[in-house]
């Protein structure tokens, strides 16, 4: 699953990665001259957890993936574990494999997952159960037991939010000192892969009566609940296959308006490169 770094690839492109600020420039190279700052993710080792949009085997060499562009531009070493069709209940398995194969050498982890939970009509569910319990407390007087309502995260693979709770709990425990970044699912349109695999566009609800928006919102909420930064790929990539003119970013206007093509993956990579400027890759 390792994708070996190619030092020297994309050097010409790297020299073009200069962002003019008031007094400084962004440098996409290992060593930077005075007046330049280095991208915080330059040269880092990053694990990628996800589905077909991340999977190197999805369309093979026909699509250059976003993480491959980041390898070229920022010399990121990618450890790619995304598998086509996988849902949030596969996050623990992918995380365990990353831990086993790369342990402490990985600097950061990026998770792009959720679109298949929507397509498979996994119920959204709720984040917590609540019940009254007694707890010791004091506010300027002698401490005493008080009855208060307490919430406990729901850990179940039967719901989307339960799966996210399990997955993020697992990631936090396996990689307590590593940067973890969540990406919201992209917009989606018609995908027709055969008689037994036809996925309507996002204007339709899934079988449990939810629009894809609920699954996007779930990732945003999870960031606050678990203390994990979220990049809203659903909006900031600017890609929407429901707009005919934007199908230039998707694989095939006839049967696959779901998967970004190389142009779409490059736009994703550009977006991610700039968004990651605000986040440290390691601590």
Give the label of every model feature segment.
Residues 4, 53, 260:
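Glycosyltransferase donor-binding loop in the core domain
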Residues 1-16:
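Single conserved hydrophobic/aromatic residue that forms the stacking wall/gate
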């Amino acid at each position: 699953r390792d994708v070996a770094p190619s030092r020297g690839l994309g050097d010409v492109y790297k020299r073009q990665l200069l962002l003019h600020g008031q007094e400084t420039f962004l440098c996409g190279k290992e060593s930077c001259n005075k007046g330049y700052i280095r991208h915080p993710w330059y040269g880092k080792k990053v694990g990628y957890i996800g589905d077909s949009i991340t999977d190197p085997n999805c369309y093979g060499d026909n699509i250059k993936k976003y993480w491959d562009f980041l390898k070229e531009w920022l010399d990121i070493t990618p450890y790619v574990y995304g598998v086509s069709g996988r849902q949030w209940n596969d996050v623990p398995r992918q995380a365990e494999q990353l831990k086993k194969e790369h342990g402490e050498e990985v600097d950061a982890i990026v998770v792009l997952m959720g679109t298949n939970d929507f397509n498979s009509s996994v119920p959204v569910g709720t984040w917590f159960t609540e019940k009254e319990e007694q707890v010791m407390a004091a506010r300027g007087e002698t401490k005493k037991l008080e009855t208060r309502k307490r919430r406990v995260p729901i850990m179940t693979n039967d719901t989307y939010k339960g799966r996210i709770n399990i997955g993020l709990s697992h990631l936090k425990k396996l990689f307590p000192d590593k940067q973890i970044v969540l990406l919201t699912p992209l917009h989606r349109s018609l995908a027709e892969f055969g008689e037994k695999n036809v996925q309507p566009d996002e204007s339709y609800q899934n079988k449990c009566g939810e629009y894809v928006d609920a699954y996007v919102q779930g990732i945003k909420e999870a960031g606050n609940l678990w203390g994990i930064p979220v990049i809203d790929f659903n909006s900031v990539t600017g890609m929407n296959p429901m707009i005919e003119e934007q199908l230039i970013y998707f694989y095939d206007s006839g049967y696959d308006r779901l998967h970004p093509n190389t142009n779409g993956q490059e736009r994703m990579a550009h977006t991610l490169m700039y968004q990651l400027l605000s986040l440290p890759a390691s601590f």
